[in-house]
Amino acid sequence: MIPANASARKGPEGKYPLHYLVWHNRHRELEKEVRAGQVDIEQLDPRGRTPLHLATTLGHLECARVLLAHGADVGRENRSGWTVLQEAVSTRDLELVQLVLRYRDYQRVVKRLAGIPMLLEKLRKAQDFYVEMKWEFTSWVPLVSKICPSDTYKVWKSGQNLRVDTTLLGFDHMTWQRGNRSFVFRGQDTSAVVMEIDHDRRVVYMETLALAGQDRELLLAAAQPSEEQVLSRLTAPVVTTQLDTKNISFERNKTGILGWRSEKTEMVNGYEAKVYGASNVELITRTRTEHLSEQHKGKVKGCKTPLQSFLGIAEQHGGPQNGTLITQTLSQANPPAITAEEYFNPNFELGNRAMGRPMELTTKTQKFKAKLWLCEEHPLSLCEQVAPIIDLMAVSNALFAKLRDFITLRLPPGFPVKIEIPIFHILNARITFGNLNGCDEPVPSVRGSPGSETPSPGSDSSSVSSSSSTTSCRACEISPALFEAPRGYSVLGGQREAVPRDEDDDLLRFAIQQSLLEAGSEYDQVTIWEALTNSKPGTHPMSYEGRRQDRSAPPTPQRQPMPPAPVPSPRPSPGPGSSSHVFRSYDEQLRLAMELSAQEQEERRRRVRQEEEELERILRLSLTEQ
């Protein structure tokens, strides 16, 4: 046992007492040391790991259990950017993954509840408003843009109440999930009511979030993951995607040619906006597969679409330093035999030796340029009015999470009336704010507040005329009925499970495979060629698609999950003799599709060059005549 004056002793047991006990798997002594509370449970060792990270990487289950029970943060990342859960999955220890997943979801619920008072205060102080957020997806592959979905989020904010309407819910079972839904957040003094209104089924799922008095054991019991959730993680690659913005820079876009260039401005929904370009934005996707069996590795490779293989994304494959093939064996932790003295010595270089199982890592990096349209005279405030809403939506929506990560950067002055940011490796999202307070198009239950323009007696009293001035758009009144359960709807006491928040690679695959325009129903499986040409699905299903298990967080104690909606069965797979024919047809379809894309892109560039040359010739002639 470490003595009381351990901190005064030299060596790792004095500098890093918790890490030292974890290293030697002395969980009983670790329990006593943590209970004493004299050492920071989130202390970092010389390799950038917390005690919990080290316990997880080494596969020391009981040490991890002690640290989690005393509040160690599951969400912390190590120096390499991996979370505790991702490291747990890489150990292939089912019990450890189940334990970490349980505490991760528990801590998410606790943080969610703890953040409600601050959110309520921000909503209370902010001015009431209505705004529409239009999401459009674009791509550098011209024809891919035509199959991407679009949606308009309608946002009402009144006092401590918030409502968001949407039709694009997410992705599940290889289909875009469409539906007419409203999400209502109604703040109260000591609690908050969250409602999900399903207008298609005329059902309201209601949940009350108490701000105090939550029983820890009940929350932990509700956070217990199912065996399917754990197995789905152990049989799938560990994937993390992040926007690297440490070198990002914003510059004003220019317009004109030669010596007549000026800073570019555009009108966006009636507001004059300065156009900025953001450079040095990198989208980095890292995939780890050392925990997968050869069978599951084969499935992962088979699930890679021809289009994903075709894309010119820089790939760097990392493996052991000797370059030999890694066999999937249940090797014990710390295979390079790193000693405690070597590990805890900050001056000792470990080189390529790593803790835990030998890592198999694939890194994909692609540089993007983002664009911003900023209006300095816009009535809305990004920090006070819009940011709290994006924070709330980002909890369960991957797209809003990407948007939040971007707007938290130090942007140039002004409100971003339009933003274009990378979401996946070939897809950008363009978000446009418009119809503020119903000034462009009438909106039911929204009207100008006293002092602003009031509709005439013969007009619709529930909306503001589209001819309203900018000044009249600065304030509005919103009907309280918007934040109540609609009449005639069935109200259920527990909210059903939300649509799973899929990994980015899932979203990319689904975006390519599904046509949401006129290419059949949303449940049809389409080939790449059918998706790119927006034609009716053929008879061959996509043989490389795989189903992703539900990885959504378990419900809180108040929830009673509803049975999931029935999903149509997939079409039968083709016979053994037809598989090679299917893959050959995909390669041919892909080649033709990319040729068409390249031709369309080249034609667009040719027209731009021709226009620039014509304009330059006219300018030269005008100067000659003078």
Curated annotation (Swiss-Prot):
Chief location category: membrane
Low complexity bias locations: 448-470
Any one GO MF annotation of this record: ubiquitin-modified protein reader activity
Start-end of Pro residues biased regions: 554-575
Residue list for modification N-acetylmethionine: M1
Gene3D superfamilies: Ankyrin repeat-containing domain
Top-level taxon: Eukaryota
GO biological process annotation, one example: negative regulation of receptor internalization
Positions of the UniProt region annotated as Disordered: 442-470, 534-614
SMART domains registered for this protein in UniProt: ANK (SM00248), UIM (SM00726)
Primary role: Ubiquitin-binding protein that specifically recognizes and binds 'Lys-63'-linked ubiquitin. Does not bind 'Lys-48'-linked ubiquitin. Positively regulates the internalization of ligand-activated EGFR by binding to the Ub moiety of ubiquitinated EGFR at the cell membrane.
UniProt-recorded name of the protein: Ankyrin repeat domain-containing protein 13B
Organism: Mus musculus (Mouse)
Lineage: Eukaryota, Metazoa, Chordata, Craniata, Vertebrata
